[in-house]
Amino acid sequence: QGCTVSTILFNAAFNTVFEHLSVIEDDCAYQFRNQKPGKPILQVFVTGYADDLGIVTGRHGENGAFHNNEKALKRLQEWLAWTRSMKAKPKKCIASGLLNGKPVDPELKVWESQGTWYPKFLEDEVFKFLGKGLVADASSTQSKEMILATFEKYAKLIDGTFLTGVEKMWIWEHFAMTKMSWSFLIHDFPPSFVEKELQPIETRYLKKWSGLAKRADPSVLYRSKKNAGMGLKEATVEHKRQRLIRRHQLATSKDPRVRAIHDQFAELQLGRHKQGTNEWKECMEMEKLRAEVKTGKIVGAPSEGAGIGFRGRRRCRPKALDKHKAEREEMLRVFSEIIEQERLVKIMSKPLVASDAHPFEKEGNYFCGWLKWEAAQAVDLSWGRVLQKQDAFLKFVLNSTQDSLPTPSRLKNWAQARASDGKCPLGCGQPGTLMHILCGCVKAHQETPQNRIKWRHDSILLAIYRAVQSRIDESKEVEKDAVPQASQFRSSLGKQFTVPHPEKDCSDRLTPLRGVFEKADDWKVQFDVGVEGELVAERPFPSEIAIVSGRGSRPDGVMWSMKTKTVIWIELTSPWEENMKSQHFAKCEKYNQLATDLRGGKHFGVKWTVLPHYVEIGARGAIQELGWVRMCTQLGITGAARRKLTHSVQDAAIYCSHYIFLCRFHRQWEPQRLIDTWRKDA
């Protein structure tokens, strides 16, 4: 007891029972139907794990299954007596027989305790064997009831706590679904049960905890993060996933009997597939996935014709120690990709209903506008982020992405009484869609002294300004600590030598990364926001570079160095995400002439090195990735600093848009201080 070797010794000793019972296996074991001639007889007799045993018997000649079972149990008792240290626990021994598919009492008499013979007939009781609940008729009825009750119990238990909605979702994802995955693995109920009974429970509570609108498409909860979702485990998908894991484990088992049983079950499902039955067949699904994995290994990762930003599938690289596990992981990855594609197809196939508020909405599908975000980086909804936010943050992000916020236009689509005419509340006469409220209202753009749309733009710009200023300050510190360019030595004869350092230092010392800001120490910065986040009057282009006016002469932020004759500018746009691509090219065209003139020396005869950057941060927090990555890389904002800046600008966009949405009925906009989401200690 307590020794780590004790379990090994026990298993080694207990395994002798299988040898003792194997003598009568051919006379007592249960043989499967439809045996194929010329192949070994497929039968099962004893199953066991640790000190738990199960004995399955069938008819052989004149001896019935019940007689053979009692014979096997009595031989087991002989082995127990031989060990002199083991004995059966009669009260934990149960039995059940099937006669023409109906449960009957086999009336086995092997052990007696207090006038009762054991194994006892199971009747209406449930016996747990190796984690699975067994009933007399060997059906899955009881397991369905147990799973359903447990599912509801977990949901109500979590819902009854005083935690935030995000925290409840985290517990559901990492505790409840993890616990349920084991039940999905060992029980045999069909996917239709999960879809009809369990999935509605999960979706209902997740919608409640996340604040997702009742009519919103719940796929945002289960879609992968690259498709603007949260990536939560979906009960229907998790059930199929566990069934595939179990089936693959059986198909690749080291036990030839287990593999033989799997093969016969697979043949049965193949026959039903040829008959055209509609149920989900795990064996057929597994073989398709394995074929996909095998094809992927042969084809490799095709790159011909791939555009910028294309990323091919990761191909299988099996581990040398366990090729079956590597294949299973790759198979499940392909399965996840297929499920994700099916979700997208379902979303794009969903028709619009009663969309009379805005003609544009008739052209597309209601819930899939985010699919038009070309090369966009969606809001980071990782647990590390959302657990630090209030529930209102997640609620706004999910509903704004799905366009399921209660705007006047959407309420009219939903036939809500409070929708009125579905027009813009500010009185411009246009349909009150979310895009119009956050980006397009003429009345909002004409507000003075501050308009709500520019307030969001300037709040995002403030985060970029602080990051740039921090980067310049950092470059000055790096310049102080820079490695000397050469070392001087004096020989024993008094002669001096100067040895230049190689460009690539082979020492262990890490040399600082020299970016554009490290090439000079006289950088000046001019942004349309103040140091304290206050609004700044529109400033003209720096006069020591050029004196210009008119269209395309005033970027949002300018950085320049007179020593290196380098000028960098940043032009920020905060549009509706579907318009980010067109806005990007419009900004490029707007400032192209200024960049051309500066490079050509048309201002004061000085040729400048011009590094223009045009970035788009969507009204709902998505980022036009190409321009954003280019800006951060060229300015030397990498690694943790880039993640910090990305989170800061996304937070600024979401916070401001959320407040703009809350003020959608306020015709008079009160000037607001810029929201500062940049934190030095972040």
Model-derived features: positions:
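Catalytic palm active-site di-aspartate
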Residues: Q1-T7, D27-N63, L80, R84-L98, ...
